[in-house]
C-alpha cells in the first residue's frame, strides 16, 4: 500500500549519518521520515565506544556549530574526556571522549523523538522508487510505499554485508543485524559505480576478568574537564572512568602469525580494502614486522556494564586464535571474551559520482551519506549526514543548496576530497588533509559556521543567542586590544620585565604585546601599573572560552594571513614539472602513504600530483620544497 502521508525527505538508516541527516532536514523545516530496520538501535555505536580525535573532533565541533546532535549527546554520555595534542598549537588540538553506549543511544533517540517535523518508522527498506532520473520514494520489506521529494541513503555497512570470523562467513549488516541485500541489489540495477570495502572490530572482554594491577591507568583530563558542544557544560557529564593500557608481545605476535593461514584477509576470502589508519592486529603484525610491541587501550563500554573494548586488536582471525592472543596480553591472562571480533565487507559507491551537495549525479533527489561513500568513522558519517539532510531539505523546498568550501570547514575538505579524488580505501579525516587548518580549529567552528547554519534554518534560538554573545564579546575584546596603547610611562620597568622579559622602549598596542610568544592573555590582563591598577584587565579573563579565543585570534593573525597567501601561490605551481626520475623515498618529510601513491601514479606535474587521491595540499607544499632543493642543488653542481 501507499503510506497516506507524503514527505519532503526520507532518510534510510538510523546510524550516525542517518540520525544527523534526519535531524538536519527536520530543523530546516522539511517534513522528514526516518526509516530504520530497528528503532532500538538508533544512534548505535557499532564499533568503538568513543567520539572525536585528531581531525574527527574538528568534524564533531562543526556538526555542533550547525545545530547537530553528536557533540551534545557525547557531553551527556561521555565517561572520559581528553584533549589530544594539548601541548601543540590550537590548530591540531582535538577533543576525544569515551562514551557510554546506552547513554549515547538514549540521548540521540530523545532528540529524534522530540524533533518537530520528524517521523520515525521501523521497517527495512528493500527498494527505491525511481521515475526516469528522479527518486520519488522508498519501499519497505512488507511492500509499504513511502513517497518523498528527496531520499537520503545512509546504509552504513549493511549493503550486501558479509561478516567474517576466520574462514567462516555469514550475511549481516553488523553482529546481530541482518544485511540490506535487496536494497544492495536494487542499487546495482541503477548502475551506480560501486566497490567493496572492509572494516573490523575487536573481541569484547568482561572487565571483571582483567587484572588491572599490572596495567597502566589512563585517566581523563580534569583541569579543566573538556566539553564537546559549544552549549555543553562539564556538569552534564556522567560519572567519569579511566581507561587502561596493555601491550602485545612476542608471544602475541607468534600466535597471530601462526593463524594467518586461516585469516580471511590473508587467504583471499576478503576482497574489500580495510581502513589504513585503523588496521586489524594481524595487519599490524604483518606490515610492521620489526615492531616488538603494540599498545592496546582497554576502554569501558559504559557505567552499567562490565564490558571492555580492547582498542588496537581488531581482528577477523578464527576464534581459537582470538582466544589465545587475548590471553597472551598482560593483565588479560584470565580474561573472558564476551563477543568475538569480526570483519565485515560491504558495498560502497564511488563518491566521484556525487555532486558536492552529496546528491547523486545520475538520480535527481537521491543523496548518499556515510560509509556508503567510502568513509570510515562515526564523525565523518555524522558530518556527511548533516550536509546531505540539509541539502535534501533545501532541494525539496526549492532553495539553493549549501556546499562548504575547503577554507570554511573540515566538512568542506571531506566532501571535496570524496567527490574529486574518490577513495581506494576507507577515508578517515586528519588535520593534515586541510591546507587551511590554522583557520579550521575546533575552538572557532561556531564562528565559522553557526551564522551559515542559522541562514539554512539549522540553528535554533538558544544556540543563536549563545553564539551571538560569544561572537560579539570576542570581536569587542580583540578590537579593544588593537586600539589600546601602552607606553613606557604607563608600564613600569619591573612590570615589563615580568611580562615581557625586558622593558619597553616605545609605545605598543595591547595586541602587539600579546603577539609575543612569551606573553599570555592571562598575564597581560593581570599586569599592573606602579599605582597597582590593572594595566589592561580584566578583559574577558573570567570566561575561559572567550579568553582562549581572543588569545588565539590575536597570536595567529599573521600566520593565518600568510597561509592564505601561500594557498594562492599553489595556483602558480599547477604546471610545474616533476622530474621523471624523482626518488620519492628521498622525500622523507612525506608520509609513507603519500610516497606510496606518488610512486604508483608517477604524476608529471604538481597539478597532477595534487589530484592524486590521498595526496594532501600539505604534502604538495613539502614536495615543492624538495623540488626547490633539487633545483638549487643542480644549479650549484653546474656552477
Swiss-Prot record:
Gene Ontology BP annotations: tRNA methylation; tRNA wobble uridine modification
UniProt-recorded Gene Ontology molecular function terms: flavin adenine dinucleotide binding
Required cofactor(s): FAD
Binding site for NAD(+): 274-288
Superkingdom field: Bacteria
Broad class of where this protein is predominantly found: cytoplasm
Functional note: NAD-binding protein involved in the addition of a carboxymethylaminomethyl (cmnm) group at the wobble position (U34) of certain tRNAs, forming tRNA-cmnm(5)s(2)U34.
Protein name per Swiss-Prot or TrEMBL: tRNA uridine 5-carboxymethylaminomethyl modification enzyme MnmG
Native species: Bordetella bronchiseptica (strain ATCC BAA-588 / NCTC 13252 / RB50)
Lineage: Bacteria, Pseudomonadati, Pseudomonadota, Betaproteobacteria, Burkholderiales
Amino acid at each position: 500500500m501507499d503510506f497516506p502521508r507524503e514527505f519532503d525527505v526520507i532518510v534510510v538508516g538510523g546510524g550516525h549519518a542517518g540520525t544527523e541527516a534526519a535531524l538536519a532536514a527536520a530543523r530546516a523545516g522539511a517534513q522528514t521520515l526516518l526509516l530504520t530496520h530497528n528503532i532500538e538501535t538508533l544512534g548505535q555505536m557499532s564499533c568503538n565506544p568513543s567520539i572525536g580525535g585528531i581531525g574527527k573532533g574538528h568534524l564533531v565541533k562543526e556538526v555542533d556549530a550547525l545545530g547537530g546532535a553528536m557533540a551534545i549527546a557525547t557531553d551527556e554520555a561521555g565517561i572520559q574526556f581528553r584533549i589530544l595534542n594539548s601541548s601543540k598549537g590550537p590548530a591540531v588540538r582535538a577533543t576525544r571522549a569515551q562514551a557510554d553506549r546506552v547513554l549515547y543511544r538514549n540521548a540521540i533517540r530523545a532528540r529524534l523523538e522530540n524533533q518537530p517535523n520528524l517521523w520515525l518508522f521501523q521497517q527495512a527498506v528493500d527498494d527505491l522508487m525511481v521515475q526516469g532520473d528522479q527518486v520519488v520514494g522508498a519501499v519497505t520489506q512488507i511492500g509499504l510505499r513511502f513517497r518523498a521529494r528527496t531520499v537520503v541513503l545512509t546504509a552504513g555497512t549493511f549493503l550486501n554485508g558479509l561478516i567474517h570470523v576466520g574462514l567462516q562467513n555469514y550475511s549481516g549488516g553488523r553482529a546481530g543485524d541482518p544485511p540490506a541485500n535487496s536494497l544492495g541489489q536494487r542499487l546495482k540495477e541503477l548502475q551506480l559505480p560501486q566497490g567493496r570495502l572492509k572494516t573490523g572490530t575487536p573481541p569484547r572482554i568482561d572487565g571483571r576478568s582483567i587484572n588491572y594491577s599490572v596495567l597502566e591507568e589512563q585517566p581523563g583530563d580534569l583541569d579543566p574537564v573538556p566539553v564537546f558542544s559549544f552549549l555543553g557544560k562539564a556538569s552534564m557529564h556522567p560519572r567519569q572512568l579511566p581507561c587502561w593500557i596493555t601491550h602485545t608481545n612476542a608471544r602475541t605476535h607468534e600466535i597471530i602469525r601462526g593463524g594467518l593461514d586461516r585469516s580471511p584477509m590473508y587467504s583471499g576470502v576478503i576482497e574489500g580494502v580495510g581502513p589504513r589508519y585503523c588496521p586489524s592486529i594481524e595487519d599490524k603484525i604483518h606490515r610492521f614486522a620489526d615492531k616488538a610491541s603494540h599498545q592496546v587501550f582497554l576502554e569501558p563500554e559504559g557505567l552499567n556494564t562490565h564490558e571492555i573494548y580492547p582498542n588496537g586488536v581488531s581482528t577477523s582471525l578464527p576464534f581459537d586464535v582470538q582466544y589465545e592472543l587475548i590471553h597472551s596480553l598482560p593483565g588479560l591472562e584470565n580474561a573472558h571474551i564476551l563477543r568475538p571480533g569480526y570483519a565485515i565487507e560491504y558495498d560502497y559507491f564511488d563518491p566521484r559520482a556525487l555532486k558536492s551537495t552529496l546528491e547523486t549525479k545520475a538520480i535527481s533527489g537521491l543523496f548518499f551519506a556515510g560509509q556508503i561513500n567510502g568513509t570510515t568513522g562515526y564523525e565523518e558519517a555524522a558530518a556527511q549526514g548533516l550536509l546531505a539532510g540539509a541539502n535534501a531539505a533545501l532541494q525539496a523546498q526549492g532553495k539553493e543548496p549549501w556546499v562548504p568550501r575547503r577554507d570554511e570547514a573540515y566538512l568542506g575538505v571531506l566532501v571535496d576530497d570524496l567527490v574529486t579524488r574518490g577513495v581506494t580505501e576507507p577515508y578517515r579525516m586528519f588535520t593534515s588533509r586541510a591546507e587551511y587548518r590554522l583557520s579550521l580549529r575546533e575552538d572557532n567552528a561556531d564562528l565559522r559556521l553557526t551564522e551559515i547554519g542559522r541562514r539554512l534554518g539549522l540553528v535554533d534560538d538558544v544556540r543563536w543567542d549563545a553564539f551571538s554573545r560569544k561572537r560579539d564579546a570576542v570581536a569587542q575584546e580583540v578590537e579593544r586590544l588593537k586600539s589600546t596603547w601602552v607606553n613606557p610611562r604607563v608600564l613600569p620597568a619591573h612590570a615589563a620585565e615580568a611580562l615581557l622579559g625586558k622593558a619597553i622602549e616605545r609605545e605598543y598596542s595591547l595586541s602587539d604585546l600579546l603577539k609575543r610568544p612569551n606573553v599570555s592573555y592571562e598575564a597581560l590582563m593581570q599586569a599592573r601599573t606602579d599605582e597597582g591598577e590593572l594595566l589592561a584587565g580584566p578583559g574577558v579573563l573570567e570566561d575561559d572560552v572567550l579568553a582562549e579565543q581572543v588569545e588565539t585570534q590575536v597570536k595567529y593573525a599573521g600566520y593565518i594571513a600568510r597561509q592564505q597567501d601561500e594557498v594562492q601561490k599553489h595556483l602558480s605551481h599547477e604546471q610545474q614539472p616533476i622530474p621523471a626520475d624523482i626518488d620519492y623515498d628521498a622525500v622523507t618529510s612525506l608520509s609513507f602513504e603519500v610516497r606510496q601513491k606518488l610512486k604508483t601514479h608517477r604524476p608529471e606535474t604538481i597539478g597532477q600530483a595534487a589530484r592524486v587521491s590521498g595526496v594532501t595540499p600539505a604534502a604538495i607544499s613539502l614536495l615543492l620544497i624538495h623540488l626547490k632543493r633539487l633545483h638549487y642543488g643542480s644549479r650549484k653542481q653546474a656552477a
